[in-house]
Design a protein with these regions (language model features):
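Short, conserved catalytic or adaptor-binding loops enriched in Gly and charged residues
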Residues: 20-23, 91, 215-219
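Active-site/substrate-binding loop(s) of hydrolase catalytic cores
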Residues: 58-65, 74-202, 229-230
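Soluble metallo-hydrolase cores and metallopeptidase-like ectodomains found primarily
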Residues: 23-57
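Conserved beta-strand scaffold positions in the cores of enzyme catalytic domains, especially
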Residues: 29, 43, 100, 167, ...
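Active-site-adjacent mobile loop/cap segments within catalytic or ligand-binding domains
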Residues: 177-179, 188, 206-253
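Extracellular mucin-like PTS domains
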Residues: 1-22
Length: 253
């Protein structure tokens, strides 16, 4: 890690119920960009945990990023984000610096639609082996060019800046996690075991412009993978996924 982001736009604090003393913030929220329609794309940094206090160049520091929503009609990942925000500091490994990105597609979340406001599938718009797919109105439209969308640009810049050691990208509704023959294979298998997700390949072949693929191929020392949740996610299941994310950190290659 060479850079840490510490420029919040808003601060969440907890205050005492008996005094006016302001306690240290549990998290900081900052905007990393705006959507087509001008909505903020916010990231949350858990600053109350020991890992957030480690020096940027500390070899023990592990930066973990969790992305709840890319496709606006796949919102179950938000429940996992909620559980990670609610965890006590003692539940989070001391070396983990935890960052949470609820959605990169606020314009899709608002009307519960897959695409952004330009009708672009953001998970076909990232700048790795991007290819033109379909046209506006098609569910898989990749946009007019690689990283054409402000949401994609914001995430590319932020990930390039933060350089997470591990990123989990949530999707729905395949209820699976893709296996890997690479160095992150044991990590994916452990996640599947902890959550009960079956290990199986993504249907439909190889896709272009995918966020997690862009991240893996651009930053080869980083681990990034997709978790496909089912159609629904109960609170207990969301908590299981939250704990699984933290439990696999020691398996990072």
């Amino acid at each position: 890690m060479t850079v840490a982001v510490e420029v919040p736009t808003t601060t969440s604090t907890t205050t005492s119920t008996t005094t006016s003393t302001t306690l240290p913030p549990t998290e900081l929220t900052m905007s990393i960009g705006t959507s087509v329609q001008g909505r903020a794309i916010d990231v949350v940094h858990r600053v109350d945990i020991p890992g957030a206090q480690l020096a940027v160049d500390d070899p023990n520091r592990v930066v973990v990023l969790v992305v709840g929503v890319i496709h606006g009609d796949e919102q179950a990942g938000l429940e996992v984000i909620k559980e990670l925000r609610a965890m006590l500091p003692s539940e989070i490994p001391a070396n983990v610096d935890l960052w949470l990105l609820p959605t990169i597609n606020p314009d899709g979340v608002a009307p519960y639609q897959r695409h952004n406001a330009n009708q672009v599938d953001l998970n076909r718009n990232f700048p790795y082996k991007w290819g033109m797919i379909a046209e506006p109105g098609n569910w898989e439209y990749s946009g007019p060019s690689a990283a054409s969308e402000p949401e994609t640009q914001a995430v590319v810049d932020f990930v390039t800046y933060l350089r997470p050691d591990m990123t989990v990208w949530f999707h729905q509704e395949e209820f699976s996690i893709a296996p890997s023959t690479g160095s992150d294979g044991p990590l994916r298998r452990a996640y599947a075991r902890l959550t009960g997700l079956p290990l199986k390949g993504v249907p439909g072949g190889t896709y272009t412009g995918v966020a997690a693929t862009w991240q893996r191929k651009t930053f080869t020392d980083d681990t990034a993978f997709i978790v496909e949740l089912g159609p629904t996610l109960a609170q207990g299941e969301a908590l299981t996924h939250a704990h699984a994310i933290l439990s696999i950190v020691p398996l990072l290659p």
